[in-house]
Amino acid sequence: MSMSDPIADMLTRIRNAQMVEKKEVNVPASNLKSAIASVMQEEGYIKSFSVDGIAASKTLNIKLKYYDNKSVIEKLKRISKPSLRVYVSSSQMPSVMNGLGIVIVSTPKGVMTGQTAYEQNIGGEVLCSVY
């Protein structure tokens, strides 16, 4: 059976792993998922990630981050879905929790935070929000 929304699956696996306080979570790998994990690592929401395995069975191993026994990620929400894509220009870039969180945006120049896309004056598809 094929997966209809692999990004939502990745975010759900991260949420579920954090609810039971796991140190790491494994997700089927793709270039887009690796780019999202890279942005989350740069922003300090996860410790690290690595791609393991060979061609067809690559997995993304994400090491989760905790502070005072609480998850660093308070909320992880998918915004643009296969059934309803959400595209924004740089002037319409949403803010999360008045700047305390981030939105992850897929742009023609790659996957980046909404703030970076705003500074570079480029729009794109809003994939998810993290805070």
UniProtKB/Swiss-Prot annotation:
Protein family membership: Belongs to the universal ribosomal protein uS8 family.
Query: Single GO cellular component annotation?
Result: ribosome
Q: What does this protein do?
A: One of the primary rRNA binding proteins, it binds directly to 16S rRNA central domain where it helps coordinate assembly of the platform of the 30S subunit.
GO terms for biological process? translation
The protein depicted here goes by the name: Small ribosomal subunit protein uS8
Database matches in Gene3D superfamilies: 3.30.1370.30, 3.30.1490.10
Q: Native species of this protein?
A: Ruthia magnifica subsp. Calyptogena magnifica
Q: What does the subunit section of this Swiss-Prot or TrEMBL entry state?
A: Part of the 30S ribosomal subunit. Contacts proteins S5 and S12.
Q: Which gene encodes it?
A: rpsH
Q: Pfam families recorded for this chain?
A: Ribosomal_S8
Spell out the InterPro entries in the cross-references: Ribosomal_uS8, Ribosomal_uS8_CS, Ribosomal_uS8_sf
GO-annotated molecular function: rRNA binding; structural constituent of ribosome
The cross-references to PROSITE patterns, in alphabetical order and at most eight, read: RIBOSOMAL_S8
**Secretion signal span:** none
Instruction: Specify the taxonomic lineage.
Output: Bacteria, Pseudomonadati, Pseudomonadota, Gammaproteobacteria, Candidatus Pseudothioglobaceae
Q: Which UniProt keywords apply?
A: Ribonucleoprotein, Ribosomal protein, RNA-binding, rRNA-binding
